[in-house]
Amino acid sequence: MFETTSDFVWQAIQPRPRDAHKGTFGSVLAVAGSASYRGAAALAVEGALRTGAGIVTLASVEPVLAAVAARLPECCLCPCKAGAEGGISPQNIEHIRRQKASVLLAGPGLGYTAQSAARAAETRALVKTLLPGFSGSAVLDADGLNAAADLLQTEKMLHPQGELILTPHPGEMARLTGHSAAEINADREGTALRYAKAWNAVVVLKGAHTVIAGPDGRCAVNPTGNPGLSRGGSGDVLAGMTSALLACGLPAFEAAACAVYFHGAAADRAAALHGETGMLPHDLLDALGTLFAENGR
């Protein structure tokens, strides 16, 4: 186990080649958002754009796309038909599959049992069908993790053809493992490592001093961040950032560890400006550019 350091992350994130083009930095397809959670999709795709992905496409329903297009003209759009509770209908699966991307991000704002059993069933169908057939790597977050937890009752962890990163907070990890959040927090490093190996995935166990564990036995503890991250939307930003670094070509463990470090470092800058109480997740996005610029990236 080691603590993620500034040297570690800046060695992993090299300056951009002078002859680079958008294809150099990969593409992210975010399957995210619903009528109730429009902001989750917006924060995730901006997190991906601000962290360097060459192309970011959002597959979502019209109200979400309208909100994102107004804020982020750089984001490509994949319009989807609405299903239960204004979420993405499984009828869109073949349409979504036709979108070319190197990384799939599934989960932010999709909706689950908090909306209805029908919404949960549709989100499960999206995850169960899209993830195994995806040719690249994937990040599973938020309601994507809730779907995976239910699917684990009857089958093994679903995988894309590439690498898989899971980004649970302790409550989501409890649903995935069947252990209580208290049990998980009592042994965060051990729990993350055990399930990273069991699921053959990188596990990002969020919380104070987020733990990043790989199936190869590596384990990092993050030193950056502050309690100002304890609000809805922070995890959506992190999911987008993680997807971007994966798309840029970093291996899954390095992508996750660097994203968590940058996320926390941006939060520390936001807290310095707005205070831990007043800062908001979108303040992290504003801080990322300065963070990269100061380090020649």
List PLM regions with ranges:
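Short beta-alpha connecting loops at secondary-structure transitions
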Residues: 177, 223-229, 239, 268-276
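Positively charged, low-complexity intrinsically disordered leader regions
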Residues: 1-22
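Alpha-helical segments flanking ligand/cofactor-binding loops in enzyme cores
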Residues: 42, 46-47, 128, 193, ...
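Charged C-terminal helix
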Residues: 265-297
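Short, small-residue alpha-helix embedded
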Residues: 174-175, 231-262
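Glycine-rich phosphate/dinucleotide-binding loop and adjoining beta-alpha-beta core of small-molecule
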Residues: 1-6, 59-224, 296
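Substrate-binding N-lobe of the ribokinase-like
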Residues: 21-85
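Short pre-catalytic strand/loop immediately N-terminal to key active-site residues, enriched for Gly-Thr
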Residues: 17, 219-233
